[in-house]
Structure formats: structure tokens, C-alpha cells
């Protein structure tokens, strides 16, 4: 086991604080509408330029191991805020730095660290409750656009695009961010259910100009197995041919004789048919086939429960108004499924989202909800260079998370004003003893830090503006972008309540633990063992 280095008390806390400040100082320059960019060197390719707090935090690794422990703990604050709300990472870092700095001063002055932490926790619980009181629902498109604009560093076009996307696919719809082809940002909306499986044979294509298969008013056969024997499908094919409608087959796979026969029938015009593989794998594939069945009012042929493909009739098939199949995707538009049954299916999937602990599963389940409930919107980010593209994509992604958080829990006045108002409301809060009272004051003083940092980044005097905002009431605050005072909500400066709440909770949680630190242990650096000495001239080894 490697030897360890141990530091105690003030010596340990000073080192830890140095690490906290190095990381937080690098992150906090990005806060607010006039926050600056940070350039991150990469081992290959061009450097990355970002204004995203968590991206900056993740890059920082310090040589001094004790300092690094402090930095890593604050990095955890930014990561947690990012996971919970997708935004507010810089605010969380600024709050954590303020609480740690103020708290460690109190510890150095002889206060009990455990009581300080209890006081901080008490203040944060009260502050979260007060934030919920101040919160207003984010109901209309205008408010959604404003939240997106603020989060995307005052880029109004991004805010409007996100609001438009939410309007088109609904609050539960999936909105993804991709690289665009040109210089402008674009919004593409996919109506209906789309999954990433294309046609199994190019001979199914009936629209050569677009390279797609289009089926109008088709039947849909869903099969949870590989189909290779055409005899199994003959009853269904005959029924569809008599009805004079096209057919889409969605199966685990269609191969060999079955695929060849379908292609021949299509080319001869006997029956208009197309086949695609079912989306997903394993249990997820079965679940998605059931989703398609719900959407199209059809059934899935599942051999596990004794159903046979030969016995399938037209009543077992789903219906939709239109289906478009490209090389990569299949889109089912206007399935004829019962709205009440679809809604109950969505509720069931939402319950699974609540219960799952896996981020990957949660993401896949949310995609399924979106496909059933609304649709999919794609924001294509345009930029002149790859470096700008990466930076812009990160901002759009942050803005998207912020707007989702705003829809979920509402909005409060932005620009750090909400926390200042909460701190003023809690001025009379008291703990069980004097040390807890100091902890409460530490937390309340830290709540001013985001406002002060926004003002500092705008090149103004923090104390003057912080006092002016504190003397105001309600949503009165300072717009660092226009350098004017006024009603923050009226000026469109909004923060999602969830983002502000998460930032405060995670910052206080980790900062509270750091204040109560008394000892730090790390591995000593290994001493390099010297190389073997030169053997020199050995006796009797001379040349003859």
C-alpha cells in the first residue's frame, strides 16, 4: 500500500480553499450576459471555446493533490446541477465558493463547524420554500422564448426557435440539437412517430425523386420474430391485395424467400408493400412494437403468447393515414389509435420514468413518450467554423434544458434577483444557538454572490448595484445587458425556478461538507527509483 500524506485543521482547509477558488474563479468569468469565454486546449484538433460552466469545471485538474481535492468537490457541484436541471452550473459554482469562503472564515473565528452546517441547511430549506412562493408558471410561448434567450447568452433567435419547437411538438416532445449545413439556425419538425429503421430493399422505393417509399392509408403488420417463409404471410397478403391497400411489415427481420417474394410482388404491382426492421433490441423492441400497435390500433403477432402469423387477419393489422420510409428512417403519420388508450400508454411509460435509476433508460423512455404524444423537432445549428459550431451547440443545449426546467417548475426573476429577495425575506430566521445563526447568515450572504458576479463581469461596481437592488422590491433588479434597472420579468429576464433551486441545494450540500472537514489524506508522490548504475569495465573483459 502506498504511503499517505496527512494534513489537519487549518492547514488542510487552506489548501482545500485554494483549490476551490482556482476552479470557481475559472468558471465564474462565464456568468451573465457579459460573461467571457474560456478557451480549453485539446490534445488533438482545435481548442474548444465555451461559456458553459460545467465544461470549464470538467477540464480542471490541479497538480497539488490537496488543492485538487477542493477543486474536485466544487466540480461535483457543477456536475450535479447540470444533471438535475441542465443549466445553472456557473451559478451553483459561485454559490458554493461563497458559502465555503464565508464558512471557513467563521470556522477560523472559532465557530462550531457542525452547527454552522446545520444553520446553512436550515437557511437553504427555508429559501427553497420561499422560491416556490415567488415562482410563476411559464405558460406562454413568449416566456419560454425569454428563458431560452437568457440561457443562450442573450441570443434571441435561439430562444424563439426553442419556443417554436415546443409549440409544434408539445411540452413532452423530443427536441434534439444537431449540426446544421449552412450558417443559419433551422428548425425541422417530424410529425408522427419516427424510428431509425429504413426500408429493407431499395426495390420498395416508389418515389425515385426523393428516394423514399410513401404508402397512403396502409395496413401495418407488426411481427415480433424473423420472417423468412412467405407461406406464413400469404393469408395477410391476399387480404391486403383484395382490400386494394398498401402494406407495411415491421418485423425483427424479413429475409430470404419472404423478402424476395415481397420485392417481386411490388415490382409487378400485385400488392404495394414495404418491409422494415423493428426498432430497438430485446425487451425495448417488444415495448416499441406495442407502442406502434397502440398508435395504429393494431395488434402485434407475438409467438410467445401463442399467436401465429398464418392465422393473422386484417382485423389484427394497424392503420395509419400515411407512412414515409427513407433509407434511414420510418415515419408513421396520423395513426388511427384510440386517444384514450394512447394516453394511458403514455401515463404507464411516465411511471417507468419516475421509477428508473438509469439515465440511459430514462432518456429512451422519454423518447417513447414523445413519439406517442407529440413528435420530434430537430434544431440544426449553423456556424461558419467547427469551433463556433461546438460553442453554439453547447449554448443551445443549455437553453433547451433551461426551458424544459421552466415549463416544469415555473420561473422567477433572473439576474440573481430572486435569491436576493429570498435572503431579505429570511433575515429574521433563527437557529437553535449562536453558531447556527452564523451559519444562516453565511448562507444568506452567499445568496447575493450570483448578482455581484454578474455585475463584476459586466464591468460595474458590485457593491453599489447590489445595494440598489436590495433596496428595491419585488422583481426590481439590474439588467446587466442594457445596464438599466427595472422589473426583471417585464424586461424578459427570467430564471427557471428548478435551475435556481438546484444550484442552491447542491452548492450548500457540498460546501457544508467542506466546512466540516478537519483532516485530508492523499497518496504521497512516488519517488523515482534510480536506474541501474553503469557496470563500467569489468576485470578480465578487455579485448584480446
From Swiss-Prot:
Pfam families documented for this protein: Cpn60_TCP1
Q: For this UniProt entry, what is the primary localization, expressed as one broad class? A: cytoplasm
Q: What is this protein called?
A: Chaperonin GroEL
Question: What domain of life does the native source organism fall in?
Answer: Bacteria
Q: Which reaction does it catalyse?
A: ATP + H2O + a folded polypeptide = ADP + phosphate + an unfolded polypeptide
Q: Where does ATP bind?
A: 30-33, 51, 87-91, 415, 495
Gene that this sequence comes from: groEL
Entry EC no(s): 5.6.1.7
